[in-house]
């Protein structure tokens, strides 16, 4: 009961802190729509790097990673996050280009180069995906609170998580999101960095734990190189076309900061990969002494609760909630931003909104979308399959149009437009054939992105050989010259 009390105090303190951040930022820092949507484009290295890291680290990279290490993956589970870390390195090439666009959203950039149809289709895919992800992540945050503090009813936990997310995101916008991301990732990293050596020491030390593990558990490539490479490409594709990632690069104070933030994020994520993996292995070695759920689903919390002080367990509890909530707030704000910035004008919105109206309607979208998401989560609507599908479909189609649209100045309009449709169709077909998994060691989002790139290059080659002019620039500065 002491552990639950410590966890409750720390988790509630964290949630109150997040609401205070949102309120203060909203009152002091939000002067116009640029402040609300892209943090005034003045964020520094550490703010952006920690925000990128927080958005990459979800429940799957904390409790999920420990569970994989406990299961068949062993120490090779570390690649589940290390692959994401490595994917941030080539992303550093695109980071300054993203910042240079001076855009707010991905559909805005796609529309500049390849026209209104491309922009509208990309916006619809992104908004549907972000809504599904927001729904599941608010639900996941509530479920984590309930699992850690079961004395609070599940629906109350869900409402609590949803209300906190709505409050600080709606009041503080992107600035509050980034400040909260900094705090959240700090809690995750510091909490796990403190807890892991304490657990290992009280469990007999790493030498004793490793001696109790089967040999395959200590094989760094147990999952196979095909899976490792597949995860790398999967992360790269989803990062480049992920609204929550792109929006962070848009907030950088300059292009150099964007490059450095991407590389620092890679370092931070590599550090994060270590701790849950070690805790999962410790839980496996000590499983005869622990009351674990099936397949070690709660391995990280159980081994921490058994071998670390209550306050450390509470810190880990807050870290797990941070991991899910940091994704929920970003997806919620990105979705509302696209509705006002892209969907509204793209589908017939006549009235040009001023700064105050943009902020008001974006905040209204935040509240409405989050309330609907909370209702869906309360009725236990299964979203896992839908989320997997939505997460890929927002990236596979627009991958070439956005990524190569930034990098290939001579691209034609049809190369971007056609690649969006072929990439999306390829993703859907591969998702069906692979039944949501992999086929020939290739994940659906990677296959869809590959098809979109091939289509983009072929159409562009054919049209340029026929003398068709290049599409307009993705960069406002170049268009103004």
Question: What are these model-derived regions, one by one?
Answer:
Residues 1-481:
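Membrane-embedded helix-loop-helix hairpins and adjacent transmembrane boundary segments
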């Amino acid at each position: 009961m002491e552990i639950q009390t410590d966890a409750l105090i720390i988790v509630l303190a964290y949630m109150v802190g997040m609401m205070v951040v949102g309120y203060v930022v909203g009152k002091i820092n939000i002067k116009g729509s640029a402040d609300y949507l892209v943090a005034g484009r003045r964020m520094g290295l550490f703010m952006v790097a920690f925000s990128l890291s927080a958005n990459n680290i979800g429940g799957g990279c904390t409790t999920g990673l420990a569970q994989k290490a406990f299961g068949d993956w062993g120490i090779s589970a570390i690649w589940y996050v290390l692959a994401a870390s490595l994917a941030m390195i080539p992303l550093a090439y695109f980071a300054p280009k993203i910042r240079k666009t001076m855009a707010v959203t991905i559909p805005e950039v796609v529309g500049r180069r390849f026209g209104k149809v491309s922009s509208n289709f990309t916006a619809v895919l992104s908004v549907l995906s972000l809504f599904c992800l927001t729904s599941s992540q608010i639900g996941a945050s509530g479920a984590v609170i309930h699992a850690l503090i079961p004395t609070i009813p599940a629906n109350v936990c869900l409402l609590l998580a949803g209300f906190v997310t709505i409050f600080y995101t709606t009041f503080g916008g992107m600035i509050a999101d980034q400040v909260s991301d900094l705090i959240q990732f700090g809690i995750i990293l510091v909490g796990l960095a403190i807890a892991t050596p304490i657990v290992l020491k009280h469990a007999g030390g790493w030498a004793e734990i490793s001696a109790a593990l089967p040999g395959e558990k200590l094989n760094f490539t147990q999952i196979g190189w095909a899976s490792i490479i597949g995860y790398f490409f999967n992360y790269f594709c989803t990062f480049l076309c992920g609204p929550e990632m792109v929006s962070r690069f848009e907030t950088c104070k300059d292009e150099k900061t964007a490059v450095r933030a991407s590389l620092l994020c890679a370092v931070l994520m590599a550090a994060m990969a270590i701790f849950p993996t070690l805790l999962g292995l410790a839980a496996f070695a000590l499983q005869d002494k622990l009351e674990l759920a099936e397949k070690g689903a709660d391995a990280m919390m159980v081994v921490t609760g058994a071998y670390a002080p209550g306050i450390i367990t509470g810190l880990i509890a807050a870290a797990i909630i941070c991991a899910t909530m940091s994704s929920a707030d970003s997806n919620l704000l990105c979705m509302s931003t696209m509705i006002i910035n892209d969907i509204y004008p793209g589908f017939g919105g006549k009235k040009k909104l001023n700064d105050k109206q943009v902020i008001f309607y974006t905040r209204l979208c935040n509240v409405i979308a989050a309330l609907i998401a909370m209702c869906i989560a309360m009725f236990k609507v299964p979203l896992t399959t839908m989320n997997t599908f939505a997460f890929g479909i927002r990236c596979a189609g627009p991958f070439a149009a956005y990524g190569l649209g930034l990098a290939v100045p001579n691209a034609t309009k049809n190369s971007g437009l056609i690649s969006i449709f072929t990439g999306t169709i390829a993703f859907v077909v591969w998702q069906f054939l692979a039944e949501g998994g992999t086929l020939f060691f290739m994940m659906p989002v990677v296959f869809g992105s590959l098809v979109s790139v091939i289509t983009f290059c072929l159409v562009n080659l054919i049209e340029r050989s026929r003398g068709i002019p290049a599409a307009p620039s993705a960069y406002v500065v170049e268009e103004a010259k």
